[in-house]
């Protein structure tokens, strides 16, 4: 295999969830003989069970294939798989930075989705050659002409000569590979310059330590050299380099333009942050632009149902953290739920995936509190605090202002659902910035508070648009607003895990709706349970869970009324005593009640 740069093609695939990206990748591997028929597990690249089950790609993967083109030359194709979901957009931008081109795979029956548009713009901004591919053209609902027009109007790239393919039946796969060889430029790089390599992804292997997927920009990386990670300034000796075919295949070295893996005995994933630059120790080059540490945006408390699982939960989070630099966690204790962890996530999908993996892979039973976002709190003394837990908000008398994170959302929705979607955005305190009609789709830009989005916005967006609307968002700024802490008291005891930060205008309405919900969820006791909603010291709503009544007079038939009175009096005193010392167990549903904010529930 000649290692000249002109015979290398680095590309990734941009596609919405379920538009057939992983299937196309499998076809490429099959066609280029990367695996035997027996080894072809459906969706080779989605190696996590959860990835296959949800049909999404979470971590970036890569494959190096040798392809014999129609022009008689053999090309080395490096395919870097990217995650498609909005929570993982930083991982996408790093995967794209390692490529010279991208395939834009669009489902011919469904058309363009907001997520695809966002990733496609990232690719175009980074100067990649984008090749459109219409997949699933054999479906009865496929409408290639409409989709071609959508691609040209919404994304603005020429799509009339797009390859028509069906990954399932293998149609158009060879043509797609020919397009890659013909249209995607070869990588530029200097084989003799000092080493410069981009870390596309890192994951932890129990035997090897951290394995990093890298794209070599200049120079070459080989075994036994001493490499340096730019952001941490740490140095390591390289133990092994190689490529994935998709099996791990060691090589002597990787040169400029190539994509492969590096193992250097790094013990934890923070040692090789995604997007960082690797150079040779003592002969450093300037770091590559665009690296930024990952910031969690959504926070939630995870508590084990039985307190003896606390250490197991810590261990499980530590193991997940090895593979997921975006996951943050620190111990937290709650009066209502005992000991647990405050965890930070990239977004809601990320949170669900972590929670599901903890329960599935580590057999833990967990209670999750309502997710919140980070707020900036300016105190009267002029200190600026970052608060990710409503229960740690300072006393209202000490607060000058509370600032909430504002996001810029881009929503793509078919014409007929625009009204419903705009109504939903208004309800979520969104401010419309821009609106464009494109064919039969509308692209709407809104600025809205992130805390309104993390609760149930995605679910409601899907239900108001019958599943057709899609959205992507990015963080804009912190902005001061009139926010208050809404607390809930059960039996006059505040339950810290139920506290939420809400806008003052909707606080009373939210408080009343939630105590009604709690009333239905909290099981009846032998005594009345009072549920109250409060802002500071002011109670804004109250309801009761009625006591169960035990018929103590059932054993008296006929006879003296004073006997019955005595028994009822005794029961009354017992209930009074019980009420003063009785505690109320809150079921998991009570903590989830805070999540859904819509009135119709």
UniProtKB/Swiss-Prot annotation:
A Pfam family of this chain: LepA_C
Organism for this UniProt entry: Hydrogenovibrio crunogenus (strain DSM 25203 / XCL-2) (Thiomicrospira crunogena)
Recorded family membership: Belongs to the TRAFAC class translation factor GTPase superfamily. Classic translation factor GTPase family. LepA subfamily.
Function: Required for accurate and efficient protein synthesis under certain stress conditions. May act as a fidelity factor of the translation reaction, by catalyzing a one-codon backward translocation of tRNAs on improperly translocated ribosomes. Back-translocation proceeds from a post-translocation (POST) complex to a pre-translocation (PRE) complex, thus giving elongation factor G a second chance to translocate the tRNAs correctly. Binds to ribosomes in a GTP-dependent manner.
E.C. number(s) listed in UniProt: 3.6.5.n1
Protein name: Elongation factor 4
Sequence ranges assigned to domain tr-type G in this UniProt record: 6-188
Main EC class the enzyme belongs to: hydrolase
NCBIfam families attached to this UniProt entry: lepA, small_GTP
Recorded topology in the membrane: Peripheral membrane protein
Binding site for GTP: 18-23, 135-138
GO molecular function: GTP binding; GTPase activity; guanosine tetraphosphate binding; ribosome binding; translation elongation factor activity
Alphabetized UniProt keyword annotations: Cell inner membrane, Cell membrane, GTP-binding, Hydrolase, Membrane, Nucleotide-binding, Protein biosynthesis
Subcellular location: Cell inner membrane
Gene3D superfamilies in UniProt: 3.30.70.240, Elongation factor 4, C-terminal domain, Elongation Factor G (Translational Gtpase), domain 3, P-loop containing nucleotide triphosphate hydrolases, Translation factors
Gene Ontology CC annotations of this record: plasma membrane
GO biological process, one term: positive regulation of translation
Highest taxon of source: Bacteria
């Amino acid at each position: 295999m000649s290692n000249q740069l002109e015979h290398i093609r680095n590309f990734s695939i941009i596609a919405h969830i379920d538009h057939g990206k992983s299937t196309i990748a499998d076809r490429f591997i099959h066609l280029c003989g990367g695996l035997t028929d027996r080894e072809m597990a459906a969706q080779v690249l989605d190696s996590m069970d959860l990835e296959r089950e949800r049909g999404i790609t979470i971590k970036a993967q890569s494959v190096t294939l040798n392809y014999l083109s129609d022009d008689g030359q053999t090309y080395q194709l490096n395919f870097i798989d990217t995650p498609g979901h909005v929570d993982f957009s930083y991982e996408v931008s790093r995967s794209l930075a390692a490529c010279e081109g991208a395939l834009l795979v669009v489902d011919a029956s469904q058309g363009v989705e907001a997520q695809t548009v966002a990733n496609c713009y990232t690719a175009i901004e980074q100067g990649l050659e984008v090749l459109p591919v219409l997949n699933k053209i054999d479906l009865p609902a496929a409408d290639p002409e409409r989709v071609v027009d959508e691609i040209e109007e919404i994304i603005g790239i020429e799509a009339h000569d797009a390859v028509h393919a069906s990954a399932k039946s293998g149609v158009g796969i060879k043509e797609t590979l020919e397009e890659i060889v013909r249209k995607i430029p070869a990588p530029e790089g200097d084989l003799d310059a000092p080493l410069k390599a981009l870390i596309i992804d890192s994951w932890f292997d129990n035997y090897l330590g951290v394995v990093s997927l890298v794209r070599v920009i200049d120079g070459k990386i080989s075994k036994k050299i001493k490499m340096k990670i730019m952001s941490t300034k740490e140095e390591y000796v390289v133990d092994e380099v190689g490529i994935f075919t998709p099996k791990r295949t060691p090589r002597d070295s990787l040169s400029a333009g190539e994509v492969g893996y590096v193992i250097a005995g790094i013990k934890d994933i923070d040692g090789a942050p995604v997007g960082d630059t690797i150079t040779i120790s003592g002969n450093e080059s300037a770091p590559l632009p665009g690296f930024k540490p990952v910031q969690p945006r959504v926070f939630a408390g995870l508590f084990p149902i039985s307190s003896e699982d606390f250490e197991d939960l810590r261990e499980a989070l530590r193991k997940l953290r090895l593979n997921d630099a975006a996951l943050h966690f620190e111990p937290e204790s709650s009066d209502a739920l005992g000991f647990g962890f405050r965890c930070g996530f990239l977004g809601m999908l990320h949170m669900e995936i972590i929670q599901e993996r903890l329960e599935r892979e580590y057999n833990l039973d967990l209670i999750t509190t309502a997710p919140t976002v980070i707020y900036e709190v300016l105190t009267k003394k002029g200190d600026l605090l970052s608060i990710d837990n409503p229960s740690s908000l300072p006393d209202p008398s000490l607060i000058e202002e509370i600032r909430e994170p504002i996001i810029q959302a881009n929503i793509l929705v078919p014409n007929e659902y625009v009204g419903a979607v705009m109504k939903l955005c208004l309800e979520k305190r969104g401010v419309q910035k821009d609106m464009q009609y494109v064919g039969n789709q509308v692209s709407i830009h809104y600025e809205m508070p992130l805390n309104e989005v993390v609760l149930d916005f995605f679910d409601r967006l899907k239900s108001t648009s019958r599943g057709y609307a899609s959205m992507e968002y990015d963080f804009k700024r912190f902005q001061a607003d009139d926010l208050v802490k809404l607390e809930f008291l059960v039996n006059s005891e505040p339950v810290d895990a139920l506290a939420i930060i809400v806008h003052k205008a909707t606080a009373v309405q939210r408080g009343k709706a939630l105590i009604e919900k709690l009333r239905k969820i909290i099981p009846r006791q032998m005594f009345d349970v009072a549920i109250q909603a409060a802002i500071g010291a002011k109670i804004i709503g109250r309801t009761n869970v009625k006591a169960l009544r035990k018929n103590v007079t059932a054993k008296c038939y006929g006879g003296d009324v004073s006997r019955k009175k005595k028994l009822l009096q005794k029961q009354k005193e017992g209930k009074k005593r019980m009420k003063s010392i009785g505690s109320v167990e809150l079921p998991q549903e009570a903590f989830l009640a805070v999540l859904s904010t819509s009135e119709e529930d």
